[in-house]
Amino acid sequence: ILCLILAGKVGSNIASEIGTMRVTEQIDALEIMGVNSANLLILPKIAAMVSFIPVLVVFSMASGITGGFLIAQFTDIISVSKYIYGLQSFFNEYYIWQAIFKALFFAFVISSVASYYGYKVKGGALEVGQASTDSVVVSSVIVLLLDVVLTQILF
């Protein structure tokens, strides 16, 4: 779920940023100066996403466990002892590593699809918005399909 949210927010930002640079001919200026524009613009975004999304996944797991504990503490839905017993008895370290591994793939897909759609924009502001929307839709579908495939492979 976290990666789908990030596909919408971060993916659209990447696509619109690179798309705006393409429309305003900043990428063309970089290429005229002899700079590899794809290497300069796309690689840092992919590296940042691949290194930071697994951290966000671990943080979201910790937040979920803490939220569950607080619900158990302040409501009568489940007792705190049953909640802690459930965490201890059903904990499997493999699930955490699996989530981190899947997050690496999702981060690469989100950033590379958004960068591709932003990099290939031709036209004006309307096309930048369309490329941003297309990148969100395509990366969300790929993340969902990749989640199914990776789950089948890892289990």
Predicted regions and their residues:
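Hydrophobic alpha-helical transmembrane segments of multi-pass membrane transport proteins
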Residues: I1-D28, L56, V113
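Short cytoplasmic-facing helical segments at TM-TM junctions of multi-pass membrane proteins
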Residues: I18-I42, V128
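Selective transmembrane-helix segments that form parts of the transport pathway or gating/packing helices
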Residues: L41-A62, V136, S140
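Membrane-interfacial helix-loop-helix connectors in multipass membrane proteins
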Residues: A62-L104, S112-A131, I153-F155
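Final/C-terminal transmembrane alpha-helix of multipass membrane proteins
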Residues: V128, D134-L150
